[in-house]
């Protein structure tokens, strides 16, 4: 019987491939570059978070950065947008390549190549690794699903306001503003 080689985070880094993530040692293809809708929402969310985080000196906002969530076998995931608090920055191992640690907030945006079922599974992985809050954005249905440890998933519609809870206290974003970014792309 052949022994299967499990890929490590270091091997994935050496490959230099942005189109792969690592799940329990197995390479998983991811879509890159993003389509227009996903790119628009990721840019908008990054801008909103960046402004808030910088104004309050809370930490860092990242776009498509790889996080080594688990070891032996390794799992590396790259959310569309993420936030790492100052406190967590001091405990995460930062060096070239992937961040060895987890984000406080991970944001995933659904698209044809990233279905909600896949993103729900990723949200569970982030939470199991220690992420405090995951937003899964569904542009097609104009909804955002909020995942938190040991809490039921909450679904917000475009008439609701998204907030940063205890991860980004004081941050709010009316979802009508977020989804308005897609209005001129509906054709």
Outline where the language-model segments fall.
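Gly/Pro/Ser/Thr-rich low-complexity, intrinsically disordered segments predominantly at protein N-termini
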Residues: 1-187
């Amino acid at each position: 019987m052949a022994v299967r080689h499990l890929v490590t985070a270091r091997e994935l880094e050496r490959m230099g491939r942005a189109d792969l993530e690592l799940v329990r040692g197995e390479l998983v293809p991811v879509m890159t570059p993003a389509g227009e809708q996903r790119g628009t929402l990721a840019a908008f969310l990054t801008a909103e978070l960046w402004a808030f985080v910088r104004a309050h000196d809370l930490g860092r906002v990242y776009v498509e950065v790889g996080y080594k969530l688990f070891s032996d076998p390794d799992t590396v995931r790259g959310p569309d947008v993420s936030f790492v608090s100052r406190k967590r920055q001091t405990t995460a191992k930062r060096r070239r390549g992937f961040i060895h640690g987890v984000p406080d907030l991970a944001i995933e945006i659904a698209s044809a190549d990233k279905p909600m079922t896949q993103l729900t599974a990723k949200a569970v992985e982030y939470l199991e690794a220690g992420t405090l809050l995951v937003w899964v954005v569904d542009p097609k249905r104009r909804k955002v699903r909020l995942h938190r440890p040991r809490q039921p998933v909450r679904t917000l519609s475009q008439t609701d306001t998204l907030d940063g809870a205890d991860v980004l206290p004081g941050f709010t974003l009316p979802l009508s503003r977020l989804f308005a970014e897609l209005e001129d792309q509906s054709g």
